[in-house]
Amino acid sequence: MSNNTTAVTGTASADPFDDPVTSNKMAIRALIPLLITFVLGTLCLQGFNLVFQQVGAAVGAPHQASLITAFPSIVLGIVCFIYGSLGDFVSLRKLVTVGLVTLFVGSIFGFVANYFFAANLWTVIIARVLQTAGEQVAGSAFLVVATKYLRNDLKVIFFGLFTAAYQLSASIGVFAAGMLSSIAWQFLFLIPSVTILFLPILLKTLPSKSGNGQKVDAFGFVIFGFATAFLTLFFSYMAWWMLVVSLLLFVAFAFYINKASNPFITPAFFKNTRWLRAICLILVFYFVNYALSPIFNAIGTNIYGMTTTQVSLHIVWAFVVAAVVGTCSGMIIRKIGIKAGIVTAGTLMFLGWTGAAFCVNSGFVVLTLCACVFYAGCGLMYSPVVSTVLGTIEKDESGRGVGMNDLAMNVSPSIGIAIIGSLLGSNALAGGSITGVTGTAANYANLLLVAAGTALLGLIVFFVFKKKIYEGNHALETEESAK
C-alpha cells in the first residue's frame, strides 16, 4: 500500500518538462498563447508609433509627443535583455504572470484615465511603459521556451512563426491605428488587454521550476539595466554624455562580473569565441534593418511628391511578404539547411537594397518590389541566425543567450538608423552615384548602396567564420534529425 502510494505521488509530482516527449507537447501549448500575446502587444506598440503626434496634440503637448514613443523604447531596450536572462533563474510561470498582469493593468489604466477623464501626457506615457514592460515578457518567454523545451526540428519553425508574427503585427498596426484614431485613439490601449484570458492556460503549460536554483543577481541586473538604458537614450537623443555614462557602467559591469561570487552572467560567457563570432552575424545583418522605411519615405516625399500615408500603403506590402516568408521559413530551413538559409536570406537582403539603389527614379512600385525582396530576406533570416547563435551556448544559458540576441537586435539597428538618419538629412552623399543619378536622388541611391554593402559584409563575415561557428553547434542537430 505504501509503495503504491509512493508510486502514485511520484507520478503526480513528476515535472512534464523533465521528459523530452511531454515537454515538447507542453511547450507547444504554451507557445501559441505567448505568440498571440506578443502579436497584440506589438500591434499596440506599432499603432502608437504611428499616431503619437496626434495623441500629443490631443493631450495638449504636441512638442513633447515624441516622449510617448521614447520612454517605452527605453523600457523595451532594458527589459528585452533582462527578461530573457531571468528565464535562467526565475520560474517562467511567475515571470509571465507578472508580465500579463502588468500588461492588463497598463491597458485598463491607459484607457480609463484618458477616455473617462481628461487625457494627460503622463498618464499616456505611464500606461505605455506598463504595457511595453508587460508585453515583452511574452516575447522573451516564447524564445526561452522554444530554445529549452522544443524538439530541435521544431525550433526553426517556431522561430519563423515568431518573426512572421512580428512583421504581421507591424503591418496590421498601421491599419488598426488609422481606423481607431478616427474613432478614439484611447481604444488602442485595449487591444492587448484580452491577453489576460490566456493566464489560466499558461499557468498550466509553463514550467514552474526556478531555473538553475541560484539566487537572482539583482545588483548585476541593475548595473546592466542602467547601462542599456543610457545606451538606448543616446540613440534617441544623440547626447554624447549619455554614451559616456553607458560605457562607464559597462566597464563597471565587466569589473563586477569578474569579482562577484555568483553574477547572473560570467566572464566565461563572453569568452565563448563561437558565440562571439555568431553574434557578429546579428550585429552586421541587422545593422540597417530600421533604415528602409525612412529612406523610402524621403524618396516618396521628395522625388515622387507622395504623402507619408501613401508611402506607408506601399511599404506595408513588404511587411506582408516578410510575414509570409517568416511563416514558411521553418519549412524552408528544414529543406535547405541552416547554412544555406542564412546565405539565401543575406543574398535577398543584398539584392533588395542594390535593386532599390539602381531604381530610385524607376517608379515607386518598382521600389516597393525591391522592398519586398529585402523583407523576404529579413523574414527568412531570423530563424536560422537565431538558431545558429543559440546553438553555440549550453541550454542552461539559453535565457541569457535570448537576452543577448534581443539586445543585439535592438542596439545594432539603432546605431545604424542614427548614422543613416544623419546622412539622410544632410545630403552628404548627393555629389553623384555609380547608379547614374544625381542630386538628391544620388544621396538616396548611395545610402541604399551603403545598406547593400552591409548585407554583403554580413555574407562575408558568415563565410569567414562559418567553420568555427558550427563546430559542435547544437543547431546542426536540427538538420541531422531531419535527415
Predicted feature residues:
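Helix-loop-helix hairpins in multi-pass membrane proteins, especially solute transporters
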Residues: 65-69, 73, 80-213
